[in-house]
Regions:
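Extended, small-residue-rich solenoid/repeat segments and analogous flexible loops
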Residues: 1-29, 93
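Generic detector of short, locally flexible boundary/turn motifs and exposed helical patches
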Residues: 1-4, 34, 88-89
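A composition-driven signal for long, intrinsically disordered, charge-rich low-complexity tracts
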Residues: 18-20, 33-38
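Flexible, glycine/small-residue-enriched loop-and-beta-strand segment within the central core
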Residues: 30, 37-134
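Conserved small/polar residues in nucleotide/adenosyl-binding loops
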Residues: 139-141
Length: 141
């Protein structure tokens, strides 16, 4: 078969702004298929900086299929960004400590949208914002 190896970091020789994402992520809760790439002229290997509020205790996953094209400055907002809105306040008192720890909601009381899943062959354009729990299926033409 022709084409670059899916295990290559930078599939275009001399053009480091494009990288195959699966070869640069270290978070086990980010799963990326072969040939999906991220294009960023500043630091293409630091894809994980675009996955926001992805706390281990939330146990949510970002799953990206094969052959996806992800442009510069795309952000994935994960479930850790959600605030409890069913009580008196949505303010996260507990994260500031100093006696406010008792206001910590149970994990099950926080809004949870599930894993964020991007199917195969999906293009995500420049500066897009993908919210928690979004499921985007394969690209259709």
């Amino acid at each position: 078969m022709y084409g670059p190896s899916p295990d290559t970091r930078h599939p275009m020789e001399g053009f480091d702004q494009v990288c195959f994402i699966k070869n640069v992520v270290h978070n086990p809760n980010i799963v990326v298929g072969d040939y999906s790439y991220y294009d960023d002229p500043v630091d293409s290997e630091n894809f994980e900086r675009n996955v926001l509020y992805h706390y281990p205790f939330m146990n949510d996953k970002l799953i990206i299929g094969k052959f996806c094209a992800i442009a510069r400055d795309v952000k994935f907002v994960m479930n850790g960004a959600n605030h409890k809105i069913s009580g008196i306040t949505a303010y996260p008192f507990s994260i500031f400590g100093n006696g406010w720890e008792g206001a910590t909601p149970e994990l099950g009381d926080l809004p949870y949208k599930g894993d964020t899943v991007i199917g195969n062959d999906v293009w995500i354009g420049y500066d897009s914002l993908i919210m928690p729990g979004v499921k985007r299926s394969e690209e259709r033409r």
